[in-house]
Amino acid sequence: MTNLTLALDAMGGDHGPHVTVPAAMQALKFHTSLNIILVGDKTEIEKYLPQAHSADLSRIEIIHTTEVVTMCDRPIHALRSRKNSSMRIALELVRDGKAEACVSAGNTGALMAMAKVLLKTLPGIDRPALVSCLPAMTGKPVYLLDLGANVSCDSETLFQFAIMGSVLCEAVHKKSRPKVALLNVGIEAIKGNDQVQQAGQILQHTEQVNYIGFVEGDEIYTGNVDVIVCDGFVGNITLKTSEGIAKLLVHQLKRGLNDGFFVRLLSKLIAPRIQAVLSKMNPDHYNGASLIGLRGIVVKSHGNADEAAFLQALNLAATEAKRRLPEMIKDRLESILLDINS
């Protein structure tokens, strides 16, 4: 099996090396062909490495830097002034071919700006998109993109997002001809703005994308569609609203189960089942948003991710690297454009 290398921004996120380093060690146990480069303050990183000798340590490399992109840094400032930051160096390792993927829990805007400048977009792709999984009633994840990388998109960009989302679903979940839809205010052909309508018309004539039409917001979690495409403004609000509703449901459920002696007694009896249901709704299980459409792989973790959640982001990056996701997107787009122009 070919060895893979992940470049990890060890200082990113709310918890820094306290979370990123132990998660990296766990990833090495799961992926025997994986190597990880930890970028950040060497002294801080070494505090969280195993003290006893471990064979896995031979697959860890540390690149020392004390500069960090903060959550308060504006993207343009980070791009111009944080040239020795752990985030930038991790991305440069991907650009220079020393790592197959970069993982960071740091400033999202800065990561997207740096990634686009350093890694460049694939031929035929105008803008990268941020995509992540959402839980669905079927038990299988649903991909939603864009989640905020592009607050406004024309029809061509939405078309490109549909291609990239379809390929990502095929690569990570090995789903043959995943169902792709555009998020809209109605399912009728006359509904929606010009950009969405025009993107739908293009996709209807693209045989290599299994486009099924428009879906409304209440269809997102049914699992009837595998990939849902929208601009970043709509996608980000949808994602944040969904996370808020999930928190509300958990809060109300816990509150209701503490309401009275008999209810508390019943809750103890059904606690394992309730825990299983809540576990499926836990955003940590879906941690890791991919910035796709670039010449390299970039995965963004939630800033407040714990060790288990950050491990999910590392697993996602390793899977995308094994599947050679950028090459798959490039080849699919070339094939589609060839069909359109023939």
From Swiss-Prot:
Q: Known EC number(s)? A: 2.3.1.274
- Which GO terms are recorded in the biological process aspect for this UniProt protein? fatty acid biosynthetic process; phospholipid biosynthetic process
UniProt key word Protease? no
Question: Which key words are in the record?
Answer: Cytoplasm, Lipid biosynthesis, Lipid metabolism, Phospholipid biosynthesis, Phospholipid metabolism, Transferase
Pathway(s) served: Lipid metabolism; phospholipid metabolism
Q: Which reaction does it catalyse?
A: a fatty acyl-[ACP] + phosphate = an acyl phosphate + holo-[ACP]
Which EC class heads this enzyme's classification?
transferase
Q: Quick one: where is this thing mainly located?
A: cytoplasm
Cell compartment(s), UniProt: Cytoplasm
GO molecular function term, any single one: phosphate:acyl-[acyl carrier protein] acyltransferase activity
The UniProt entry's GO CC annotations, sorted and at most eight, read: cytoplasm
Family annotation (HAMAP family): PlsX
Q: What does this protein do?
A: Catalyzes the reversible formation of acyl-phosphate (acyl-PO(4)) from acyl-[acyl-carrier-protein] (acyl-ACP). This enzyme utilizes acyl-ACP as fatty acyl donor, but not acyl-CoA.
Q: Which family does it belong to?
A: Belongs to the PlsX family.
Q: Which PANTHER family match?
A: FATTY ACID/PHOSPHOLIPID SYNTHESIS PROTEIN PLSX, PHOSPHATE ACYLTRANSFERASE
| Subunit and partners | Homodimer. Probably interacts with PlsY.
Q: What is this protein called?
A: Phosphate acyltransferase
